[in-house]
């Protein structure tokens, strides 16, 4: 029996998981999404063409891969159908768990209305309705993908739900959709998605029993984890490696190696603590060179320096075996680069992540910059200062770097 490997983001998301999964999946038979929804965005560049994925696993660009959307994902049928239209011959290559929960239009309307009402205390959600979808799931009022196979019955149940929520909808200023509108959409969803809906847990058990190679693709980042992230400025799912197990129906004995994806600097979308954020020229420069615009939201990402304290924390949470260092080329040309090696917290220097991270200030180590790493595919050809930077990140995080990305292109990846 084979074991599944996991790729997980270990900052605040947007680390470059899509590129590394796309690179790795040529060695895997299955690539699987386990959590989140279309709030997560993966960008992949192949031969100069940009692909933006939100629900589809990143293995879809490799035709030998079978792609699985697991039970832990919340699926918006409209978004998924739109993404599927970019690709040909998906039957037999894409499967959706019948146990995955649905994300529908009213979830997004609730999300957006609540954010407006919170004003300056808004979480900064993507407005895609992911939180409300998970709320319905946890309160046992949700609906699952498998229910799309009986659209009339699902429509009746949704109308009953809406009637119960009528007062809440009125407060938020949301108009209740009509039965006919909903049924029309549900029938369309069934027509397109029915061939792809199945029990993906049993499928993966069988694959592992047959020694197939399986890669689990995390969404978002560990610092956004519902339990271990910067609460309440977090997502609504478990984004650490443990979540990949429940999100696909696997057990701990079925896991092989865990690869942590990390940028050579740090970014964050939305509100919440970010100790190493740089609000000056360097932060602006990083964002400009790195094209730090959210794939799902179109919002500018906040930018700052590598936070080794946070990475060491998430490395332990995830049980990392190796790091994949992304976007090293973005730091090309900086005279010096900084690493947050510790925090100043309530008058003391600490080397851990407190639950009130907003009260921590960065303590930096400054290193000399380098000229250019962009496009380099051989570690020995990297500038010495870039090598010193990588080595220092390994020392501070406690994890060896196994992959280095030097451009958005698939092939510009150093494998150590």
Curated annotation (Swiss-Prot):
Annotated IMP binding sites: 14-17, 39-42, 126, 140, 220, 235, 299
Catalysis: reaction(s): IMP + L-aspartate + GTP = N(6)-(1,2-dicarboxyethyl)-AMP + GDP + phosphate + 2 H(+)
Entry keyword set: Cytoplasm, GTP-binding, Ligase, Magnesium, Metal-binding, Nucleotide-binding, Purine biosynthesis
Molecular function via GO: adenylosuccinate synthase activity; GTP binding; magnesium ion binding
InterPro entries hit by this protein: Adenylosuccin_syn_GTP-bd, Adenylosuccin_syn_Lys_AS, Adenylosuccinate_synth_dom1, Adenylosuccinate_synth_dom2, Adenylosuccinate_synth_dom3, Adenylosuccinate_synthetase, P-loop_NTPase
Pathway named in the protein's UniProt entry: Purine metabolism; AMP biosynthesis via de novo pathway; AMP from IMP: step 1/2
EC number(s) reported in the record: 6.3.4.4
Cofactor: Mg(2+)
Active-site residues per Swiss-Prot or TrEMBL entry: 14, 42
Residues noted as binding substrate in the record, renumbered to the chain: 295-301
Cellular component per GO, a single term: cytoplasm
Positions that bind GTP: 13-19, 41-43, 301, 327-329, 405-407
Compartments where located: Cytoplasm
Family in the record: Belongs to the adenylosuccinate synthetase family.
Function of the molecule: Plays an important role in the de novo pathway of purine nucleotide biosynthesis. Catalyzes the first committed step in the biosynthesis of AMP from IMP.
Record-linked NCBIfam families: PRK01117.1, purA
Protein's name in the database: Adenylosuccinate synthetase
Originating species: Campylobacter lari (strain RM2100 / D67 / ATCC BAA-1060)
């Amino acid at each position: 029996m084979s074991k599944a490997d996991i790729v997980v983001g270990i900052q605040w998301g947007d680390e470059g998981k899509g590129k590394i999964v796309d690179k790795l999946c040529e060695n895997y038979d299955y690539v699987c999404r386990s959590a989140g929804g279309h709030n997560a965005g993966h960008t992949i560049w192949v031969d100069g063409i940009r692909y933006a994925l939100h629900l589809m696993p990143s293995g879809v660009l490799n035709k030998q891969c079978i792609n699985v959307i697991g039970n832990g994902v919340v699926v918006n049928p409209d978004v998924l159908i739109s993404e599927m239209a970019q690709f040909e011959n998906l039957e037999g290559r894409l499967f959706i768990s019948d146990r995955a929960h649905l994300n529908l239009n009213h979830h997004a309307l609730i999300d957006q209305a609540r954010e407006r009402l919170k004003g300056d205390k808004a979480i900064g959600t993507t407005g895609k309705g992911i939180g409300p979808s998970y709320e319905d799931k946890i309160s046992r009022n949700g609906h699952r993908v498998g229910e799309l196979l009986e659209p009339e019955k699902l429509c009746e149940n949704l109308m009953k739900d809406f009637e119960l929520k009528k007062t809440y909808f009125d407060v938020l200023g949301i108009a209740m959709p009509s039965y006919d509108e909903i049924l029309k959409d549900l029938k369309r969803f069934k027509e397109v998605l029915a061939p792809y809906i199945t029990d993906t847990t049993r499928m993966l058990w069988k694959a592992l029993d047959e020694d197939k190679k399986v890669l689990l693709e995390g969404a978002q980042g560990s610092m956004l984890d519902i339990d271990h992230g910067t609460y309440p400025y977090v997502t609504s799912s478990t984004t650490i490696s443990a979540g990949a197990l429940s999100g696909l129906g696997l057990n701990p004995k079925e896991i092989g190696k865990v690869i942590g994806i990390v940028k050579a600097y740090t970014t964050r979308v939305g509100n919440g603590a970010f100790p190493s954020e740089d609000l000056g020229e360097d932060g602006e420069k990083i964002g400009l060179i790195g094209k730090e615009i959210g794939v799902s939201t179109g919002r500018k990402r906040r930018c700052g320096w590598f936070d080794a304290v946070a990475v060491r924390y998430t490395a332990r949470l995830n049980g990392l075996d190796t790091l994949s260092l992304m976007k090293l080329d973005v730091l090309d040309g900086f005279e010096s680069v900084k690493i947050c090696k510790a925090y100043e917290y309530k008058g003391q220097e600490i080397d851990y992540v407190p639950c009130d991270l907003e009260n921590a200030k960065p303590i930096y180590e400054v290193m000399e910059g380098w000229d250019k790493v962009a496009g380099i595919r051989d570690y020995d050809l990297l500038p010495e200062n870039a090598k010193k930077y990588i080595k220092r990140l390994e020392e501070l995080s406690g994890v060896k770097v196994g992959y280095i990305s030097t451009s958005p292109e698939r092939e510009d990846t150093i494998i150590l």
